[in-house]
């Protein structure tokens, strides 16, 4: 991923009111002259807007003015690997509307007014790797990938206790405590090594293995933040499925201090940190469209009318609801 800042200014169409069209125009003009032959544009994130020289306006829609200026951070990636992913989605019957970085989604999940004014970092512990991103006033300025993730914990448990990977994952998610000092030596777990052999482990032993790997991972992420920036970090958010481990927040506090905290998604139905990138990406996409005065809906206007009509038959409404949920749940 490559990022750099550009600046552009355009004349406003109607002095009496700046609209989403004006914002689209200034952002599109900012991209003119950029070399996208080898790289694909992923995001054009406006830092701020200026109306007739007035600075630090986040959303100028509705204001009066003759000129609109912006500073934009653009992010690009190599075309070839991205196009391979898009081709797989196309063959799967999935329409690609837009592309984004998962780190943007993580930020929009935890985004608030305080974070929009300072420098901070977000750590997402994935299955195969850990993503470390640094944000300045809500704009991603640095990003790095550590090739260690939650699956490494599963492999450690498999190596130590001779369990298969599936059983190791259950041990990690349902039995282990991230901080072994909080574990109970009297709490045990039984599992089969093969059809004739069973094994019993206690919570302290399992938790020590988990803690060792998770602590190492957090130290790697901490060092990576230092490598990415020398600015003062005002917040650190840790997310990803592994952050749901029992006692994880205590381990985070030991490694980072009170500057760090674990993501806490409160939205009903997705109260798990494994969804942070997906949930935040939806919010980011909606915010992006709102700034440009645009809207996107997965449901057609006809279906909306059927769903809201009091004259519709119950069966019709049920069909529409099924269609809506069909976008998210497939048998």
Regions found by a protein language model. Name each.
Residues 177-179, 232-252:
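Glycine-rich phosphate-binding loops at beta-strand->alpha-helix junctions
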Residues 1-121, 164, 178-186, 193-196, ...:
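Nucleotide/phosphate-binding catalytic cleft detector across ATP-hydrolyzing
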Residues 147-169:
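A conserved active-site cap/scaffold subdomain adjacent to cofactor or substrate pockets
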Residues 89, 157, 221, 238, ...:
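Residue-level signature of catalytic and energy-coupling elements of molecular machines
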Residues 1, 112-142, 157:
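Gly/Thr-rich phosphate-binding beta-strand-loop-beta motif of the actin/hexokinase/Hsp70
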Residues 218, 222-235:
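Phosphate/pyrophosphate-binding loops at sites that engage ATP/ADP/AMP, CoA/4′-phosphopantetheine
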Residues 264-307:
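Glycine-rich phosphate-binding/hydrolytic loop that grips phosphoryl groups
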Residues 115, 252-257:
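Short, solvent-exposed amphipathic alpha-helical segments in soluble enzyme
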């Amino acid at each position: 991923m490559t990022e750099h800042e550009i600046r552009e200014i355009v004349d406003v169409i109607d002095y009496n009111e700046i609209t989403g069209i004006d914002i689209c125009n200034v952002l599109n003009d900012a991209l003119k002259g950029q070399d996208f032959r080898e790289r694909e544009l992923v995001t054009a994130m406006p830092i701020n807007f200026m109306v007739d020289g007035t600075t630090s306006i986040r959303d100028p829609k509705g204001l009066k003015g003759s000129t609109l200026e912006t500073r934009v951070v653009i992010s690009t990636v190599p075309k070839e690997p991205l196009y391979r992913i898009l081709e797989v989605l196309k063959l799967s019957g999935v329409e690609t509307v837009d592309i984004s970085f998962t780190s943007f989604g993580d930020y929009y999940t935890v985004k608030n007014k305080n974070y929009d004014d300072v420098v901070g970092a977000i750590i997402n512990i994935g299955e195969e790797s850990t993503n470390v991103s640094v944000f300045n006033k809500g704009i991603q300025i640095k990003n790095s990938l550590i090739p260690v993730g939650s699956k490494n914990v599963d492999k450690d448990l498999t190596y130590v206790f001779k369990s298969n990977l599936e059983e190791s994952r259950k041990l990690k998610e349902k039995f282990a405590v991230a901080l072994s000092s909080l574990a109970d030596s009297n709490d045990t777990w039984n599992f089969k090594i093969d059809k004739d052999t069973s094994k019993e482990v206690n919570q302290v032993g399992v938790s020590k293995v988990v803690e060792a790997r998770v602590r190492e991972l957090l130290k790697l992420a901490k060092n990576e933040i230092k490598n990415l920036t020398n600015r003062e970090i005002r917040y650190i958010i840790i997310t990803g499925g592994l952050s749901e481990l029992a006692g994880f927040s205590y381990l985070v506090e030991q490694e980072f201090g009170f500057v760090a905290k674990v993501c806490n998604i409160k939205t009903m139905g997705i109260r798990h940190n494994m969804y942070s990138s997906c949930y935040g990406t939806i919010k980011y996409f909606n915010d992006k469209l709102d700034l440009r005065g645009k809207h996107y809906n997965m449901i057609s206007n006809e279906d909306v009318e059927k769903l809201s009509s009091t004259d519709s038959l119950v069966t019709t409404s049920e069909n529409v609801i099924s269609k809506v949920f069909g976008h998210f749940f497939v048998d």
